[in-house]
Structure formats: C-alpha cells, structure tokens
Amino acid sequence: EASVNGPEMIKRGEIDEATIGSDILDSWLSDDTTKDMVSMDRPNTNYTYFYMFNFMPFSHEFSNWSVEGMDAEYEPENWAKAINNTNFRKSFLYGINNSVTLAVKAPEGYDNYKLNTITPPSFCANADGVDYLKCGDLANITEFFDEAKAKEYRDAAIPELTAAGVTFPIKVQMPYNPSSTDWDKQCQVFKQQLEGVLNDGFDFIDIIITAGPSDSFLSSVRRNGKFAFLLCNWGADYSDPQTETDPFYQAEGARGSRYAFLRTGVEDGFITGDTADAVMNYMKAIEAAVEITDDINARYDAFANAEASLINNALVVPMGMSIPAYIATRLNYWEGQYASTGFSNKRL
C-alpha cells in the first residue's frame, strides 16, 4: 500500500517515509504544509547507470539456465546484424543526450550526476593521488553527445548495414520496470530525443518502449535477453577498478551471469569482425590488469585503458550516477552508517 499511496500515508503519519515522484514534486514544494518534509535522499555514490546493447538476441542454452532472447516481433535477426556494426553503435554513443533523461529524475539539477564513464569520479585514486578517471586513456574521455558526429556515424552505418541485409527502421526494444519511479518517463524522453537526432533525414531506428513485469524484472528481461537496448546499473563492491568490470568481463569459456555476455557472443559466433576484436581486446586487457598487484599506478592505468576501450568502441554507453529520489521522511539518513561501496550506507 505504501508503494502506491505513500505520499498520502506519510501526511497522515502512518509511515515514516515516502518517495515523492516528479509528477507531484512541484505541488509538494509549493505547499506550505508539505514543503519542509521534502528532501533528496542520501546519495548512493557507488551506483552508476549505463545502457547495454543485447549482443545475443536469440535463445541460448547455458549450463545453469536458458535465455529466451528477443520476441520475433522485435526482429532479432535484424538487430543481430545491426549490433555488430560499430558505426551503428557509435551513432547511439554520440546521439544520446544524457542531460535530457537525467533531468526527469533531477529537475532541480542533474549536472553532478551525468557520467561519460562507467566508474564514477572520486571512486579511487592512484599512489600519487590522481583520480582514477584521470588515469590512462580515461583521462581523454569527455562529453560524447554531438548531434553532427552522431549523424556522421549513422550515415556511415547505413550503406554498411544495407549491405549486411539490415532493413530500416531498425526496431530497438527498450523495456522498463513499471515499479521504478519515473523510469517510464525517462524512456519516453529518451525515445523522443534520440529519434529526433538519428531519424533526422532518414528513418533509421524505431525505439519500442515495453513495460516489463514489476516483479522479477531482471530475471524476466535482462537475464532472459528480452531487450535490444536497456538501462542497467552496477554498484561497486570495493574500492578498486576491478569491481567495475564485473558486468562486462567473462573468463574464457565462462557462462557466468554477466550483463552483456560479450565473450560468449564471440565464442558462439554472434559477435564477429571488428566488434569481436574490440571485445577480445577488452577481455585480454582486463586479464592483464588483474595480474598487476605490486604497482598501483600501473594497475589503475591498465584498468583505465580497458574501460576506455569498452566505451570508445561503443560496447556500452555511459549514462550517469544514481540520482537520489525526492522523499518525504521522518528519518535522518545522515545519522546512519556510511561507506562509499557495499551496503553500509543502507543501514540505520
């Protein structure tokens, strides 16, 4: 009941906390009886969000479970050809304006939450006190959003995709969890923004927003391969860049529960050509970085180079940090335990 009627229940003193969605935030802030109850939740700085492409859109058997893959109505065969094209993926990397979607959840200010990397700033520093994001090739990564460049990649991709037998517009299934506050609104804004860029002058993509189940969303959607493009997140478990590789890295022959199954895609022939080369270069770079245990600067540079290659090859698209919800609360979270990684910051 609290998840549905929380704002009214906290007014009546029946619960201690309720999330205030963007649709009612303005009215709560302008009402003298409620404005002092509203604040942003304590930031969860170890969680970052990024968009994942589904490189394995077909049914697939693993040793411990089966992946169903995308439904036929979303044309998985067409998507599989498109996703193997680097220029196609880079049109997304440069075409997405994260400011627009972040503004849905942070109408009072979103700049501090936008990321061009997977690892957040101030996550860790090397032996010289240099922030990890200033190490190696990550130091060269800046804002990606560039409409002109996105269209250049799109225009380069069109003849390549046509030669591969791709039909346009390319269907892009983008699910959301209806129980997550404002995720549906973010998807609508995302669709309008990206299609506005990439469909300017050519019917390039058709983003199809689908509502997943409120319960068991990850098992039903992400782990089941029922998406083309999906907003995912990851929370660091410890303060070393190796923890940020968990959603992407797979050991040789591994069938672990990873977000993208990049190595599986190469090993089983879903991912080919330049994309396969980029995937395997990343895997080898991570394996080399893990072995560096006696030189923190060299270790961080190696991980930074690997993360930069993952992003620059558009195998993943960074989005932002976890944006604290606006809440009405009778609790003081700032009095609770805190750690920048793990779950100590969730204890009261």
Could you tell me what each predicted segment is?
Residues E1, R12, N140-A148, D155-A236, ...:
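Ligand/substrate-recognition segments at binding pockets and active sites
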Residues E1, S30-P43, Y51-A82, C124-A148, ...:
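Short, solvent-exposed loop/beta-turn-alpha elements that line the ligand-binding surface or hinge
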Residues E1-W28:
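Ligand-site clamp/hinge motif
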Residues E14, L29-T33, F55, G95-G109, ...:
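Sec/Tat-exported extracytoplasmic proteins
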Residues D16-S22, A228-C232, P318:
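Paired acidic/hydrophobic, glycine-rich loop segments that form the ligand-binding mouth/hinge
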Residues S22-K35, A236-P241:
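A ligand-binding cleft/hinge motif common to bilobed small-molecule-binding domains
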Residues W79-L198, N305:
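Append "and occasionally in soluble cytosolic enzymes with long acidic Gly/Pro-rich linkers
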Residues L102-K105, A156-P178, V279-R330:
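Bilobed periplasmic-binding protein-like "clamshell/Venus-flytrap" ligand-binding domains
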